[in-house]
Amino acid sequence: MKNYLASLRTDIWRTSSARYNAARRLKRKELFSTISLALFSVQTIALAVIQKIYAKEFNATGGLDDYATSLSILAGILIIAISLMGWGSRNGSNADALYKNAEELNALQRSVNLEINKIEADSVEDWKVAEDMLATYEQIQSRCDINHSPLDDLYFITSHRKSPEFAYKKIQGYEARWVSFVWFLSSIWYYLIFWVISAAAMIPVLSAISLVARTICTPGFG
C-alpha cells in the first residue's frame, strides 16, 4: 500500500508541475502578446510621423510612400489579429486557473507524503486512506477544465530526469536542453517571426530616407 501511495504521489507531483509549467508558458505568451501590440502600435505611429517629417525624401524615392503606407496597414492588421488571438485564447485567465489547480494538487501531495510517513502496517484502514486520496486527486484534477499540454509534462520529466521516478527513461542532457528550448519557444515563436518581419520591413524605409537625406545634404546637389 505504501508503494501505491508513493506512485500516486508521483502522479500528483507530475500533474501539478506540468500545470505550473503550462501556467508559466501561457503567462509568457500573454506577455509577448502585450509587447507585440505595443510594438506594432508604435510602428504604425512612427511610420505616420516619419512620412510627415521626411515628406521630401519620400517624394524623391518612387514607391517609398506607398510602401510605408502598406507597412502601416499591415501593422494595423497584425494588431487586430493579435488582439483577437489573445481574446480567444484567454491566456491570462487560463494560466491563473492552471496555477490554482496546481496549488491544490501540491497540497494533496503534502497530505499523501504525510500518510506515507504514518503507515506502519498494511491494513484495511490504510487502503481506505489510499482510496480517499485517489478520489481527491481525481476530483481536483477534473476541477480544472483546462489541461496542460504534453510538452509541459515532457519539460517537467526532462527537468527531473535524474529523479528516481524518471531515471529509468535514461534521458540525456542534450535531450533535456532541446525540450527546454522547444518548450520556451512554443508559445512565442510566431510573435518572434512577426517582430523579425516587422524589423526587416522597416530597413528599406530607413535606408532610403538615409540615402536621400545624404544626397540632398551633399554640396552641389541640384
Model-identified regions with their sequence ranges:
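Conserved non-transmembrane functional hotspots
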Residues: 1-37, 87, 92-188
